[in-house]
Amino acid sequence: MTTARSFSPLSPTPYRAVVFDMDGVLADSEPLYFEIERASFARHGITLGEAEQHAFVGVSLEEMWRTIKERYGLQPPLEELLAAHQRNVLEAVAAHTSLQPIPESAAFIRWLKRRGYRIAVASSSPIALIHLLLKQIGCLRDFDIIASGEEVKHSKPAPDVFLLAAERLGVPASECLAVEDSHNGVRAAKAAGMQVVGYRNPNSGNQDLTPADWIVTDYSRFMV
């Protein structure tokens, strides 16, 4: 693994496309999600420790609630739990107009587009949330394609959403570079056959990014 100090996977590059996760990579949204999750869990009498909650970073909402339902024996149907949580998230994000893009992410996207890279989002979030959040931070139209976790059978850390992104891009996974902030996401991209940049975001919790090929703390490392 190469550290941020010697990071240069795009200079020169074997890649034709860059595939971004969204939350914690493009938008600094994980703290808001943690807050919504704590409130949702509390309504069912559940309190998770920090490490337990951080373990869900990168997985789909459906997979998170399936695990919670099984672990704590919740009675409501999974569909009901998921629908209520999705409504809460969409309402909170729509109201939270101060959500910020990750520093330098917009500049990095422009840098990639000027150099002819195809760019994609591969997020575990529902498609409606992806569109809403990317629109809020001003980069929805910058992406060639979007792949959502609700469109595939298996959530991260399975590779499904990254394979879907590569298919829609028309680029082999081996020619895509993925950018992820979570352990689950890094594992998913690696399983898809992509090389991976782990983006170290302290707001995403204590994430083990060591399976990534490179680890960075800011996007200026790319633009060399």
Model-derived regions, located:
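Asp-based, Mg2+/Mn2+-dependent phosphohydrolase catalytic module
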Residues: 2-16, 110-113, 126-224
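Hydrophobic alpha-helical core bundles mediating ligand binding, dimerization, or RNAP-core interactions
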Residues: 33, 37, 41, 61-68, ...
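Short phosphate-binding/catalytic loops that engage adenosine nucleotides
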Residues: 46, 117, 194
